[in-house]
């Protein structure tokens, strides 16, 4: 029998984990009692993707937000098979919680586009809303910290998501701003001194921009961006692809460290995907990007300048997804460069023979 090592949580680890937000109506609203737990979990996972929708501007002409969520994505996250995922999606459609709009082939752009997935708002029971209102009033009179409403919490939590570069400090900050009361130690709740101390200690480690003046936030961002190259020195991957000119370019065009970090991650993802694609087609080969440091870094700098020039000169609305445009641009460059080097080495080997 396998023995598991069990550890208790320390006070500093409580907020260090990432969480999905589970909509309460999925469990308490009688209209949706027929949903399975997998159905509810799928709704929650799709709702979480709205964070990426907002950052990528996945908003249709009617200003409705949509997501992209493949069957493989749901299979992996729910740990179920393809048929089960199909049934789950159909259940959500039958209950009026999901709508799928097929995109298909766009003859103008000559591309196949994935289906758009829209989550639909649930039908609330009016009596539930009244009871929630009464409950909130009762809490105010009881001295118990009042929970934010579902809509208030959504507005704060849904904006915390970033790219894969999320870290626990950001998520902790977002949770602290979500309207959820901060839980103190198991002490006398009537002690005003205890409450003041708890708030004071928490605020000292809350780095949300909400805790600073706009001038302070601007100064902080400028400092981090001006030293962007130094912050990357501990990253074993980033210096391999980016020279000083590229780092300075990124720092000039992005106003926040989050934006600069996401730009760098996009370039790295394009490079890694290009390498993986080549290996899947021709098998393992001895070509590594780091072997061609200077050449590749100069190419990235030139491609970045072309990208920013395109962003500046393109007509408003023509490029709907700048992040995706950068990824495709870099991916095409990596693919072509890698193919050219491999072909040159192949020709060199043939000439020796």
Curated annotation (Swiss-Prot):
<protein>
    <recommendedName>
        <fullName>41 kDa protein</fullName>
    </recommendedName>
</protein>
<keyword id="KW-0614">Plasmid</keyword>
<dbReference type="InterPro" id="IPR010724">
    <property type="entry name" value="RepA_N"/>
</dbReference>
<feature type="region of interest" description="Disordered">
    <location>
        <begin position="132"/>
        <end position="197"/>
    </location>
</feature>
<feature type="compositionally biased region" description="Basic and acidic residues">
    <location>
        <begin position="157"/>
        <end position="169"/>
    </location>
</feature>
<dbReference type="Pfam" id="PF18008">
    <property type="entry name" value="Bac_RepA_C"/>
</dbReference>
<dbReference type="Pfam" id="PF06970">
    <property type="entry name" value="RepA_N"/>
</dbReference>
<dbReference type="InterPro" id="IPR041151">
    <property type="entry name" value="Bac_RepA_C"/>
</dbReference>
């Amino acid at each position: 029998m396998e023995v598991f090592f069990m550890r208790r949580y320390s006070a500093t680890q409580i907020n260090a984990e990432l969480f999905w937000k589970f909509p309460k109506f999925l469990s308490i609203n009688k209209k949706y009692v027929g949903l399975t737990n997998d159905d509810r979990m799928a709704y929650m996972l799709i709702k979480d993707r709205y964070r990426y929708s907002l950052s990528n501007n996945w908003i249709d002409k009617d200003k409705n937000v949509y997501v992209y969520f493949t069957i493989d994505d749901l299979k992996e996250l729910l740990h179920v098979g393809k048929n089960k995922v199909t049934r789950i999606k159909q259940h959500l459609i039958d209950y009026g919680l999901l709508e799928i709009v097929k995109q298909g082939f766009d003859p103008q752009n000559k591309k196949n586009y994935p289906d758009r997935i829209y989550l639909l708002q649930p039908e609330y029971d009016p009596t539930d809303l009244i009871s929630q209102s009464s409950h909130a009033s009762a809490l105010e009179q009881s001295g118990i910290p009042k929970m934010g409403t579902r809509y208030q919490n959504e507005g704060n939590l849904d904006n915390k998501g970033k790219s894969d570069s999320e870290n626990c400090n950001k998520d902790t900050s977002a949770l602290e701003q979500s309207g959820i009361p901060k839980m103190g130690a198991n002490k006398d709740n009537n002690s005003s001194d205890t409450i003041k101390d708890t708030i004071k200690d928490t605020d000292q480690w809350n780095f949300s921009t909400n805790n600073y003046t706009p001038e302070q936030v601007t100064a902080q961002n400028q400092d981090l961006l001006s030293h962007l190259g130094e912050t990357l020195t501990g990253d074993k991957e980033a210096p391999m692809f980016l020279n000083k000119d590229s780092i300075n370019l990124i720092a000039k065009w992005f106003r926040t460290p989050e934006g600069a970090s996401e730009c760098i991650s996009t370039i790295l993802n394009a490079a890694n995907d290009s390498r993986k694609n080549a290996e899947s087609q021709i098998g393992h080969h001895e070509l590594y990007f780091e072997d061609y440091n200077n050449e590749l870094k100069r190419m990235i700098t030139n491609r970045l300048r072309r990208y920013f020039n395109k962003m500046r000169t393109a007509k408003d609305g023509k490029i709907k997804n700048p992040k995706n445009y950068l990824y495709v641009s870099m991916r095409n460059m990596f693919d072509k460069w890698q193919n050219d080097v491999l072909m040159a080495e192949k020709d060199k080997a043939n000439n020796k023979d």
